[in-house]
Amino acid sequence: MAPKVTSELLRQLRQAMRNSECVAEPIQAYIIPSGDAHQSEYIAPCDCRRAFVSGFDGSAGTAIITEEHAAMWTDGRYFLQAAKQMDNNWTLMKMGLKDTPTQEDWLVSVLPEGSRVGVDPLIIPTDYWKKMAKVLRSAGHHLVPVKENLVDKIWTDRPERPCKPLLTLGLDYTGISWKEKVADLRLKMAERSIVWFVVTALDEIAWLFNLRGSDVEHNPVFFSYAIIGLERIMLFIDGDRIDAPGVKQHLLLDLGLEAEYKIQVLPYKSILSELKTLCADLSPREKVWVSDKASYAVSEAIPKDHRCCMPYTPICIAKAVKNSAESAGMRRAHIKDAVALCELFNWLEQEVPKGGVTEISAADKAEEFRRQQADFVDLSFPTISSTGPNGAIIHYAPIPETNRTLSLDEVYLIDSGAQYKDGTTDVTRTMHFGTPTAYEKECFTYVLKGHIAVSAAVFPTGTKGHLLDSFARSALWDSGLDYLHGTGHGVGSFLNVHEGPCGISYKTFSDEPLEAGMIVTDEPGYYEDGAFGIRIENVVLVVPAKTKYNFNNRGSLTFEPLTLVPIQTKMIDVDALTDKECDWLNSYHQTCRDVIGKELQTQGRQEALEWLLRETEPISRQH
């Protein structure tokens, strides 16, 4: 993985920072966040500005360029990847480590007095802007909006913004019509005297209107904004895709609807001008709702006295709690996904000993088996197919230069998922096709114990996900080990594979309490640099728990695994498990047999069925 040579790009960018045609006044630093104008985690090629400038293409990271320095902040998932992809012009800032300065503190330490720090106001989230501006201002510096993105100025072959056809989803998939969703949203707006609600997150717009797209690879979303009023709906979207007969019928565009459900379609780039026009007509007490994750440009288009910011929008919270149709769809999707993976692992067991399977060919085979399943649309993220030392790169994606051959001597980790019309999947399994070492088994067993501890947890209603994070780490901590990523994230229903507002992470952030119907992942891991990676990941559904007592009548919750793929018992030090942990695994494997075995039979996949039965034999400790 040769690093990208960035000297000339940095020279051009620094020149733009001083050029009066690009900035009103020279700036001494320029910030390049990861996201797009919608603060998306996964972005279209035209928005990969940070990757273009630095070579680092992980999904999380912020680049800051000054006249003399170029620094990159990223989290523990990407330390190894960033170090390999960036050349020596760059300094890697490892977020979460005690000696790593924050972006603000670093800027204060390196900037000359009275410096101006620039950033594209359409890309930077409002909450980030406020935090950065406050620290810089206190040190005598200024954070300033640069309306023409400077990276775009030097990116001569920047791709066009995608504008692909839309897909409509019926009630069998969504459970609720878009009109009902708008009505529910308006009730929440009325409760707080909100007259307009600005929707900027792409997955929230897709969910609200029961539409899907493919403008961003692996994420079924489309570039758009929406403004919902108490009596008006405005959808900002480009291209003629809204005129497709199925879409027009779905959105009722040709019907003489009552005005409150009539959708006004406007150009995508007119969002700021239209928002300013709406705000000009507000009476003194009227408020406009917007997420504090929305761009600073959108937030600033709303006068401060009328602006009502929130960390999570009502759409974000409603989307996270799956209704019965969405939950049923997610179950169907995970059954199909398990069938594909049983086929894959059976194939790998046969082919790896022959010596011809690589990380890339294994990932391709996983996609091939998934494509055979009904309603398959796309992968849900690039497959992480990694063997041996590549497994220690947490978000590794194989490329020809790094592509290793799977062998009988190394641990193999595959983290993969799919988008089906009825749901989104995300599953990780770690396997050995030969004989694992005692240390590999020991580490795998610690990870498994953590996985079981979360999955089997019973906790009071109202518990936030970060309180469960230590459950996953306890066995690792006992031996002085740990992992540098969160334990779980929310999962969309045929939407983004990562979604808020819930999750399981050691980071203290304003996550919403877990409630029945939410879907998250359970994915502890352990990574030995230069040797191997281990992760066990299931998607789980939050469900009510049956308990002996009910303190203060508050109720309890637990998790139901939706992922039903065998966990390789060869990798387990069974005697290190408790009886309760053995019982959990045996029960889980029995469910795999009952549910996935039946589907494999229905689809006539006999060899994969035989593999499933072999891999789900009960285990027991030697007493």
Curated annotation (Swiss-Prot):
Show the catalytic activity. Answer: Release of any N-terminal amino acid, including proline, that is linked to proline, even from a dipeptide or tripeptide
Q: Name one Pfam family in it.
A: Peptidase_M24
Work out whether the entry's keyword set contains Metal-binding: yes
Transmembrane regions: none
Please describe the organ and tissue distribution of this protein's expression: Expressed in all tissues tested, including liver, adrenal decapsular tissue, adrenal capsular tissue, corpus luteum, testis, submandibular gland, thymus, brain, cerebellum and heart. Highest levels in testis.
Q: Name the cofactor(s) required for activity, per the record.
A: Mn(2+)
Catalytic activity, EC: 3.4.11.9
Cofactor binding, per record: Binds 2 manganese ions per subunit.
**Cell compartment(s), UniProt:** Cytoplasm
Q: What class of enzyme is it?
A: hydrolase
**InterPro entries linked to this entry:** Creatin/AminoP/Spt16_N, Creatinase/aminopeptidase-like, Creatinase_N, Pept_M24, Pept_M24B, Peptidase_M24_C, Peptidase_M24B_aminopep-P_CS, X-Pro_aminopeptidase_P
N6-acetyllysine, modified sites: K304
Positions contributing to Mn(2+) 1 binding: D415, D426, E537
Subunit note: Homodimer.
- Function comment: Metalloaminopeptidase that catalyzes the removal of a penultimate prolyl residue from the N-termini of peptides, such as Arg-Pro-Pro. Contributes to the degradation of bradykinin.
Q: What is this protein called?
A: Xaa-Pro aminopeptidase 1
